[in-house]
A protein has these predicted regions:
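Short secondary-structure boundary/capping segments
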Residues: 6-8, 17, 98-100, 119-121
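C-terminal alpha-helix
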Residues: 151-155
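Short, hydrophobic/aromatic-rich beta-strand segments within well-structured domains
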Residues: 17, 25-28, 106-110
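Short connector loops at helix/strand junctions that flank enzyme active sites
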Residues: 11, 39, 101-105
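Conserved N-terminal beta-strand and adjoining loop/helix that marks the start
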Residues: 2-25, 47
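NUDIX/MutT-family hydrolases
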Residues: 105-149
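Active-site-adjacent beta-strand/loop module that shapes the phosphate/pyrophosphate-binding cleft
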Residues: 78-117
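Conserved Nudix-box catalytic region and its N-terminal flanking loop in Nudix hydrolases
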Residues: 20-68, 73-74
Length: 157
C-alpha cells in the first residue's frame, strides 16, 4: 500500500480581528513556545473554499464563536477587501509544499457583543484576553496583525 501523500497547507489564509463595539480586541496566545499573541488566523481547507467560509470556520475552531451562515453573528463578519502578502516564518515552512515561501492573507473583522464567551482549542491556543485596540496592536507578534488592528476603526460602521 503506498504511503499517503502529505497534506500541505494552502498558502492563502484569513486574518479575523474579533472586536466589540467599543473596539476591545480579542487576542489569543498560540500554544507554540513563546508569547505569540494574535487574532484568529487560518488557511483555506481547499483551493475553492470561499474566504468568508474559511474565516467563519477558523473563528469557530479557534474561539468557539459561531459566525457561520445561519448563526446569530453571521452578518457581523466583514471582509475588508485588503490583503497582506508575506514571507512564511521559517519555523512554519514545513507545513507548506516545498518551494512555497509566501502566503496571501485576506483581512476580516467580526464585531461581537462584549463578554462573548470564548472557548479555545488547547492544542492551538492557551489563553485569551480582550484589550483596547491600540494595546492589542502593541501585543501582537505579527506586524501585519498589528497593522490590521490599527486599521480597525476605519472598518467599523
Amino acid at each position: 500500500m503506498p504511503s499517503p501523500t502529505p497534506r500541505f497547507k494552502i498558502p492563502e489564509s484569513v486574518l479575523v480581528v474579533i472586536h466589540t463595539p467599543a473596539l476591545e480586541v480579542l487576542l489569543i496566545r498560540r500554544a507554540d513556545p513563546g508569547e505569540h499573541w494574535q487574532s484568529v488566523t487560518g488557511s483555506k481547507d481547499a483551493p475553492d473554499e470561499p474566504l468568508a467560509q474559511t474565516a467563519a470556520r477558523e473563528v469557530l475552531e479557534e474561539t468557539g464563536v459561531d459566525c457561520g451562515v445561519g448563526s446569530a453573528l453571521a452578518g457581523a463578519l466583514r471582509p475588508w477587501g485588503l490583503i497582506n502578502v508575506y514571507d512564511i516564518y521559517p519555523a512554519w515552512a514545513h507545513r507548506y509544499a516545498p518551494g512555497v515561501t509566501r502566503n496571501t492573507e485576506h483581512l476580516f473583522s467580526l464585531c461581537v457583543p462584549a463578554q462573548v464567551p470564548v472557548r479555545l482549542n488547547p492544542r492551538e491556543h492557551t489563553a485569551h484576553r480582550w484589550l483596547p485596540h491600540h494595546a492589542a496592536a502593541d501585543t501582537c507578534f505579527s506586524p501585519s496583525n498589528a497593522e490590521a488592528i490599527l486599521l480597525l476603526p476605519q472598518f467599523v460602521p
